[in-house]
Swiss-Prot record:
This is Phosphoglycerate kinase. InterPro entries: Phosphoglycerate_kinase, Phosphoglycerate_kinase_CS, Phosphoglycerate_kinase_N, Phosphoglycerate_kinase_sf. PANTHER family: PHOSPHOGLYCERATE KINASE (PTHR11406), PHOSPHOGLYCERATE KINASE 1, CHLOROPLASTIC-RELATED (PTHR11406:SF23). Monomer.
């Protein structure tokens, strides 16, 4: 899938309206984690170096289509100014004369950030009037917000109906790596899935089963599969209404010759909190009532490492346990290290967004994978083989 990028257009003196993903945690008016802001810097800097006038659009949180002070982007403008080393002008409005005036006064090489796009009810409804207003401010639309690519909103899809839309560098990288692992992975291809819910991963399992050689399953979702196989899972989290589906997926994998690898042991405790009594049990011995599995055990870590050892392509989506608590983080950490080691051997390794990306950051391993996706829901939908509206709306490269 070849999309036009910011490098394919002349930006000198042009007004560029850029959809970025600045949906970052803010507390007491201070940005707590600026990973997403940093991720957008290469595209913003490139546009400025080319002599563009840059207008930035982003959402933050889930305001109900009206202004709400705790979701203001003002703290983001401040942090972006520090990271860019230059003033970022900020307009506390999304539409209207104040916005028009600020854009008219913008000079080449200057940046303007508008207020949270979701302060307007038309954003999430992809309202053509709102999109038309934003498009009227600029000559070119740059879409660098992969995190919202699975949503058809006014700021990413709507504007593209009125002015040409091209991909920013971050979007380009997401498309490149996710396309590779979804459509033409080098084999052996191993998929590692975790997280709480089987229901979130059904589409991914079904789609990647067509290409994968092995699928390793950890995280709380493993207990739904283990229960489907008749194992005793104690008080572990199980999606009772998905047990039959888990059986079907295991059958389907067998038919397709895909090896599904489930944990052989687990770290259990009676409560999900730090410092509680914990022990390791083998899955075949069963988990006692009142205890729940909160991480994969050491034998499973070794098994997973062995199943990963020859992989040329790895996709990892979802943690192996409750990694936020150190007592239950070891499984996730060891799997992350094993996948990182494969990157050094030349394998393509892609970490899906959301919790897996948070885990990788927690262990300081973010630079040791081919690609760590910035989009949770968007990366899942891409891996499911769906067409994402926020990518479809970007102009295709001319053949």
């Amino acid at each position: 899938m070849e999309k036009m990028t910011i490098k394919d257009v002349d930006l000198k003196g042009k007004r560029v309206i850029m959809r970025v993903d600045f949906n970052v945690p803010v507390k007491d008016g201070v940005v707590q984690d600026d990973t997403r802001i940093r991720a957008a810097l290469p595209t913003i800097k490139y546009a400025l170096e080319q002599g563009a006038k840059v207008i930035l659009l982003s959402h933050l949180g889930r305001p109900k289509g009206e202004p709400s002070p705790e979701f203001s982007l003002a703290p983001v403008a401040k942090r972006l100014s520090e990271l860019l080393g230059k003033e970022v002008k900020f307009v506390p409005a999304v539409v209207g004369d104040e916005v028009k005036k600020a854009v008219e006064e913008l000079k080449e090489g200057e940046v303007l950030l508008l207020e949270n796009t979701r302060f307007h009810p038309g954003e999430t409804k992809n309202d053509p009037e709102l999109a038309k207003f934003w498009a009227s401010l600029a000559d070119i639309h740059v879409n660098d917000a992969f995190g919202t690519a699975h949503r058809a909103h006014a700021s990413n899809v709507g504007i593209a109906q009125f002015i040409p839309s091209v991909a920013g560098f971050l979007m380009e990288k997401e498309i490149k790596f996710l396309s590779k692992v979804t459509y033409n992975p080098e084999k052996p291809y191993v998929v590692v899935l975790g997280g709480a819910k089987v229901s979130d991963k059904i589409g991914v399992i079904t789609n990647l089963m067509e290409k994968a050689d092995r699928i390793l399953i950890g995280g709380a979702m493993m207990f739904t599969f283990l229960k489907a196989l008749g194992k005793e899972v104690g008080s572990s989290r199980v999606e009772e209404d998905k047990i039959d589906l888990a059986k079907e997926l295991l059958e389907k994998a067998k038919e397709k010759g895909v090896e599904i690898v489930l944990p052989v042991d687990t770290v259990i405790a009676q409560k999900i909190e730090p410092g509680v009594e914990k022990k390791v049990v083998r899955i075949d011995d069963g988990i006692p009532e009142g205890w729940m599995g909160l991480d994969i055990g050491p034998e499973t870590v070794e098994l997973f490492k062995q199943k990963l050892s020859d992989a040329k392509t790895v996709v990892w989506n979802g943690p192996m346990g409750v990694f936020e608590i150190d007592d239950f983080a070891e499984g996730t950490k060891q799997v992350a290290l094993a996948i990182a080691a494969l990157t050094e051997k030349g394998a393509i390794t892609v970490v899906g967004g959301g919790d897996s990306a948070a885990a990788v950051n927690k262990f300081g391993l973010e630079d040791r994978f081919s690609h760590v996706s910035t989009g949770g829901g968007a990366s899942l939908e891409f891996l499911e083989g769906k067409e994402l509206p926020g990518i479809a709306s970007i102009a295709d490269k001319k053949k």
